[in-house]
Amino acid sequence: MNAMTDLATAPRVNYQTNPEQYQHWSLKVEGNVATLTADFNEDGGLRPGYKLKLNSYDLGVDIELYDAVNRIRFEHPQVQVVVVTSAKDRIFCSGANIFMLGVSSHAWKVNFCKFTNETRNGLEDSSTHDGLKFLAAVNGACAGGGYELALACDEILLIDDRSSAVSLPEVPLLGVLPGTGGLTRVTDKRHVRHDLADIFCTVTEGIRGQKAKDWRLVDDIAKPAQFANAVAEKAAALAAKSTRDAAAKGIRITELKREITENRLVYNTVTVDIDRAKRQATFTVKGPQGALPNTPEAIHAAGENFYPLAMARDLEDAILNMRTNELDIGTWLIKTEGDPKAVLAMDAVLAANKDFWLVRETIGLLRRTFSRLDVSSRSLFALIEKGSCFAGTLLELALTCDRIYHLALPDDADAPRIATGEANHGWYPMATEQSRLQRRFYEEAEP
């Protein structure tokens, strides 16, 4: 059996994990600083056929990274800055594992790159919207996707040891463009001159030391003897810019309760029914029922069971499962069940408590989950039927779709209706920073 056959018959990818199961990352929290240390297990690849040498990564590495960052968001809200570094000698991260890519199908590579992109975008999203800052403490060679991970952080500190360099060697070595935002972030985020960026992307060995700083490829450099102190100083400076409450108390995030069978995924708030003959899946999101906790104390007591948070976690896991494990299901039908008034009441609770850290992080998870639908490479159709609750936050589900079909019952008092609210006007911006209403109607003032 060859590596490609192994990949085709491999078990389902599971996006649920926890720190006790990590093989590649370690998470350490001290006060308002969290440290994520990369020490990728060479023999811990998600699929057979390759070894994760030189801190190169595959999907399993990024699943752990995403889980760790999410735990910092919810279990450690006192953390104001995350330091990303490496435990390997003279190696920070060498990027995506080339042998993994070589034995992977095109669809696998698409899903892999999409998830790694979303994970790095999530770092920037949390920095911009929620005040969680990130420092890349680059203590060794930093190439390809490793540099793209560093680029997603707020600042990059490079060790000046005469050998460690940052590089994007994909073009000269592989004849492909960097796949996780490297080119865009080098020019648009770090404002590297275009001529220097051109040179940088054709230099296999990369750029190190003072030149890397002069070219704006990193923010600062430090000699090995001063590196630890420089990391601490940079972390303290970034923490001072954070809006997160250093006295906040976190909640516990446990494994999702779900049942996965051949043609069905069942969560507490989301159900996915698969019709293989039609190559389509129906996502049904259940709206909130009853009154929600409406004070910071009550919301905190509800924890992971707070409906908007629980729904976001269920929906996100369902999306990731379907994207990765059901490649032949090309059409997703999006439905909702519930009372539109209850959804708008939920949004009122979120609006009234938007300064409370758990509500802010819940809105952030919803924002990132809706963005996953925006780029899921499937045909998405929203079906607005009797009993639907496409209102406010849940209307965003329909607005992420390619098309929206509304059952017309003009003479029926119980005809389905949609409703907009405050949530649809800026809570969940797309990658373009527009609301989905703005994007759908191209910012028209009137219909």
Regions found by a protein language model. Name each.
Residues 1-45, 148-152, 191-303, 307, ...:
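Amphipathic alpha-helical segments at domain termini/boundaries
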Residues 2, 107-246, 355, 359-447:
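Conserved catalytic cores of soluble enzyme domains
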Residues 2-16, 53-65, 133, 158-159, ...:
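Charged, low-complexity, helix/coiled-coil-prone segments
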Residues 4-12, 20-22, 48-55, 62-64, ...:
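Extended N-terminal export/anchoring regions of large proteins
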Residues 23, 55-58, 93, 99-102, ...:
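Generic, ordered loop/turn and secondary-structure boundary motif
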Residues 31-38, 58-107, 117-137, 159-163, ...:
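A structural preference for short, pocket-lining loop segments at secondary-structure junctions
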Residues 34, 38-48, 57, 61, ...:
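Small-residue-centered hinge/linker elements
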Residues 51-52, 97-105, 153-154, 219, ...:
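Short secondary-structure boundary/capping segments
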